[in-house]
């Protein structure tokens, strides 16, 4: 009898543990993050411009976006950490609760979203796939590179698009795939291929950071545009909603010209969207479990969407990338902003 009771008790404890783990990992909420007292963002080790340390402080686009989440949840922009996650492990990291949101220059295919059980949050920015050449050239057409060897990342979207581009334009490329981006870079700089193809941000990053006597040139041809998105676990719908509106808030501030210098002039705005955005009407942010005036705090320290983009990836960054797709749709770009109502 005692033995049976012990077994039943043990079974009950195990059941509760399993249920708790599934509840936490499968349906993460803002309150779960609050109880942990830190927000955890996934990033990629392949893109230095997204996450790096400078004077013991995390810098880069992903660091600044994660600061927005920390400011909105805790009122402290430094209550966050970044974790390097490989592409194949994104779903596992999200659904196990290892990270709350995946940033890290991620653009998953439909098959990857389904198989990894992840949910897109919002488009963070647009990148584009380009070619880089080992030699300086005055070529005016990609036909002049016909039959060249092209380095790409194995089983990547870049490999798929490079092959489709090659077939479409009948260039006869010999496309060589490498298991990771480090191997791709090494192959390119040891003359195993004349061209390499990947995202403009990655290509700019490694061309500028690897010391070599070999001249290189990023070619003007665009293979495709790449929407870079944030992702949450597939069942974390409440958290997904909160993160989506946080990202939208930075874009909305930019679309209205809200900066640290102008923000006080907007506190008397009669726009419902602006009143909700700045926490004058507190209900909208509080309904998501977020601090109502976090946008004002973040804008004053880090700026709006375009200021974050520009200093980390855009024209004012070391990459000096001028990508018009990262403008608002009304300015000829692809970014769409929702009113906060």
Predicted segments, located by residue:
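Solvent-exposed, polar/charged alpha-helical surfaces in well-ordered, non-transmembrane soluble domains
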Residues: 31, 63-71, 88, 92, ...
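Bacterial N-terminal signal peptides
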Residues: 11-18
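Sec/Tat signal peptide C-region and signal peptidase I cleavage site
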Residues: 21-25
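C-terminal functional modules
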Residues: 280-341
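Extended ligand-binding regions for polar small-molecule ligands
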Residues: 67, 71, 135-139, 143-144, ...
């Amino acid at each position: 009898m005692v033995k049976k009771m012990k077994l039943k008790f043990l079974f009950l404890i195990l059941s509760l543990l399993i249920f708790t783990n599934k509840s936490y990992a499968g349906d993460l909420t803002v309150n779960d993050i609050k109880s942990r007292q830190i927000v955890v963002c996934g990033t990629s080790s392949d893109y230095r411009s997204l996450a790096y340390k400078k004077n013991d402080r995390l810098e880069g686009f992903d660091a600044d976006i994660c600061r927005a989440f920390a400011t909105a949840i805790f009122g402290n922009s430094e209550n966050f950490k970044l974790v390097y996650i490989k592409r194949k492990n994104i779903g596992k990291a999200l659904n196990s609760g290892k990270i709350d949101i995946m940033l890290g220059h991620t653009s998953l295919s439909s098959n990857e979203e389904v198989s990894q059980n992840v949910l897109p949050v919002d488009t963070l920015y647009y990148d584009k796939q380009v070619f880089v050449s080992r030699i300086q050239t005055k070529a005016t057409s990609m036909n002049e590179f016909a039959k060249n060897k092209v380095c790409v990342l194995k089983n990547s979207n870049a490999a798929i698009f490079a092959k489709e581009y090659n077939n479409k334009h009948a260039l006869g490329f010999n496309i060589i795939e490498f298991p990771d981006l480090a191997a791709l870079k090494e192959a390119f700089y040891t003359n195993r291929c004349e061209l390499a193809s990947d995202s403009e941000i990655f290509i700019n990053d490694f061309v500028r950071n690897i010391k070599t006597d070999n001249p290189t040139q990023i070619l003007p041809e665009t293979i495709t545009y790449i929407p870079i998105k944030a992702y949450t676990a597939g069942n974390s719908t409440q958290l997904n909603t909160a993160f989506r509106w946080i990202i939208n808030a930075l874009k909305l501030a930019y679309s209205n010209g809200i900066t640290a210098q102008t923000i006080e002039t907007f506190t008397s705005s009669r726009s419902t969207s602006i009143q909700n955005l700045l926490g004058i009407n507190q209900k909208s942010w509080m309904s998501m479990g977020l601090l109502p005036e976090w946008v004002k705090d973040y804008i004053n320290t880090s700026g709006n969407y375009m200021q974050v983009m520009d200093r980390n990836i855009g024209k004012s960054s070391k990459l000096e990338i001028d990508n018009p797709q990262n403008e608002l749709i009304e300015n000829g770009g692809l970014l769409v902003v929702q009113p906060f109502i």
